[in-house]
């Protein structure tokens, strides 16, 4: 056969053998490859694996740095986690009106239960009616009947930047519950929220609608816990500093200079045995799922402040580690001011899921089921409903 009669061979692609007389095929190609484009197609095909890796690396870097793959000047991109958070936030905002409706429905149901309970009490007599009325008193009326003692509880919120958004939301709900419990207690303390100057304050000012500005008997300070404790010495000695009543009734000779400042921490080697008049007790406002163990204790030691832990191990057999939420610690302290008994205070406050049981036989006759109401903070992790309720009570 003459050379001119032989069919022209097509160039091989990807080193694959092509049968003579057959049409060359490229994997993934849509149309035929012309002679002029064969060489460039072959080059592009060989370079694609490395290009894919480069694109992936660039995309990953952009996700980390918030930059677009086309350059630093491009619009920022979001990672998958950021997109999920954004969607959850959008969903949360979209459901705001529905949550408001549900809160109103709960309020109506609560009023109906109150009315039914009063009707039932009237049938049982005047004494039962009076007890029922007291049980349903508003926060303001309970606050007016409550006796202020010369003791201060400081919630240290200086760890704002160490928490995740959801943890900050949880802390906001715990502060709300702490305020509510203290306001309704028969014997209440001075309550202070220190280092209230970061993202937590922003949440209270925006999402929670500044309802905390209507709260009574609580101070929100930008100063840290050490400065707040020094300020507490002055107002506890003032004309509205509180009475030596309740558990302090037998300490009429107590002097302001005998008071102390104690930072409560489960990491402390010291055990708190009692609360003293004209003293300030600091509680770490930190929700961190054990990422920053011992940080509250270290903060107190660094400022030369005494530390102590609640005597939980002396009275309660715990199934889990002895770390409680901020509002639980506050309520335990308030219960002690009312009862003067750590065992009773612990068993009334510590959540049942922590498996707490009294060690002492002297308390076996007491109700060993912790109150369900302390779980309300976790039932409403957003804290919006709790803050609204507390704000409403403060304005009445």
UniProtKB/Swiss-Prot annotation:
GO terms for cellular component: cytoplasm; nucleus. Residues 1-109, 354-396 are annotated as: Disordered. It holds the Pfam family tRNA_m1G_MT. Its EC number is 2.1.1.221. InterPro entries: MT_TRM10-typ, MT_TRM10-typ_sf, tRNA_m1G_MeTrfase_euk, tRNA_MeTrfase_TRMD/TRM10. PROSITE patterns: SAM_MT_TRM10 (PS51675). Monomer. Belongs to the class IV-like SAM-binding methyltransferase superfamily. TRM10 family. This is tRNA (guanine(9)-N1)-methyltransferase. It comes from Aspergillus fumigatus (strain ATCC MYA-4609 / CBS 101355 / FGSC A1100 / Af293) (Neosartorya fumigata). The gene is trm10.
